[in-house]
Every structure is written in C-alpha cells, then in structure tokens.
C-alpha cells in the first residue's frame, strides 16, 4: 500500500512539473508584444513610387523582422496630397514621404521644399545643404515649432524640367501654357505667363490627353518616361528651374516617440540607404533617357535668354527673404552655397 501511494505521488509530481514547464514555454507567446503598424503615404503615384518610396518601406519591413510593419499607400490613396500634413499631424496616417510645399505644410520652410527656383543644380546639392550648411537643423526646428509632426530626413531627386505637347525654344513659348507644377514653382513660373494647375497626380496623363493641361513642370525626364507622361507629350525642355527636388520623410510625433530606439535606428538607416538608391536611379536615368530616349524630342532655350529666368529667381529670392527670419536665413545659405559652387566651377556649376 505504501509503495502504491509513493508511485502515485511521483506521478502527480511529474504531471505537475510537466504542466509547469509547459506554462514556462508558453509564456513568451502569451506576453509577446504585438507589432507596431504604420500607414504610410507617399506623394508619388504607383509607377514612380516603386522606385522612390517602396524600396525604403520594403527594407524597413525586412529589417524590423516583424516588430514594425508599414503599409504603403501611393498618391491620394488615403488622403489628397495637399492634406498630407494635417492627416499626419492628427494621426490619420502615421508617416509620409513628400515635399513640404505639396503637402501644404504650415512650417516656415514650406516654400523651400519641392522646387525652390534655382536653389540647386544637382541632386547631391541637397544632402550637402542639409548636412554641411545647416538646413537639417532649420527643418527640425521648424517642425518642432508646429508640433505633431517630426521631420526625419531630406534628400534630392530629379531636376524640374518641362515636358509639353508643343515645343519650347524661347521664353515667349511659355506664355499661356497650363502646366501641372508645384505651388511655389507655379508662383514663380507665373511671371513668365505660365498658368499653374494643381490636380491629383494620377489624373495628369489624362488631363494632357483631354487638353486640360499643356504639359508639366514637375520632374526630370526619368519620371516622364516612368509614369507615362512621355507617351502624351512630345517635347522635353533641357533648361530647368531647379536642379533637384527637395523631399523629406516625416512621421507623426507621438508615433515616433513611442517607437523603440532600435526600430528608430532601423527606420533612419533604411531611409538613408534609400537616398543612395534614388540618387543613382535618377542620375543614370536622366543621362540615358536624354541620350537614348525615343519618345521626347529635346529642346533648349539659349543660355543668354534663359538668364532672364535666373535673374527673376534672384528677385524671387530677395522677396522671399523679406518674409521672415527663417526665410532670410535659408536664402542666405542658398546664396552662400551658390557662391561656393560658382567659384568651384565645373562640374559643380555650369560655368
């Protein structure tokens, strides 16, 4: 009898031990954290977004290993591009890739995002201006003042050329053209008779076909071919009003604050890697498509005549610099940098 009782006690002990062990093994599954989920919208349509935004999002999702999962939306899919800032600030979306101008940012730096006339000549000017000349600190501070949105990083992309249905060979040819363009760029181009038009990104190609638009002053030739605009316009003007688009990555302030430090590092590293990808994609694309592209005929306005646009940009800079302390500071940096690259000569400047 005593022997049977001892056997029963051993069985009970083993059973209890097994249950306890199972509980320990199951504990991580019970207490595992749910992945952080973000909804991210880019300024770019699907065809362009495949190159300018999606590689970064894919890299973040892989590197985060399930701890952060970002769902990417393209231009106007969740909210119109002009409402991106407010949607981000209120938490309707969690992160954004856009220029300050297009998303109607209330920050003091708004008009300098996108294409500020004649501020840059090459894509690499943008990281130099932000990292070596102080623009990063200005942008960061500007969004801290507004609140609700954290600025993460900026980069350069393609120049702002013209692709149109009719050829442009003089400034007079710009008069009356209805062009899809950025707010500040449109404000500047209106000095030459351009009628700036703002419509949803994905509607632009059809608007050219129906005659609502005469073309675009929105991008370089790489984007024209990538998104289909080269199929509906016949000419590409090699003169540009800016050498590189200034675009940034933004995140809702609270969502960023709540993100663990190691995931913040993942996000920032993947964004920086994406900057490199876009630099080579655009730089190579602009050259190859100008040299070998068959859809758009290249045209140019003579340098002497184009000088009028450069002079008008100087006047525009002065007007903008008088609008506030931050604007004056940024314009001063642009002037300082222009003096440096002009003195350096080719390939930094064109003279």
Would you name each region that the model predicts?
Residues 4, 9-126, 135-137, 141-351:
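N-terminal secretory/targeting leader peptides
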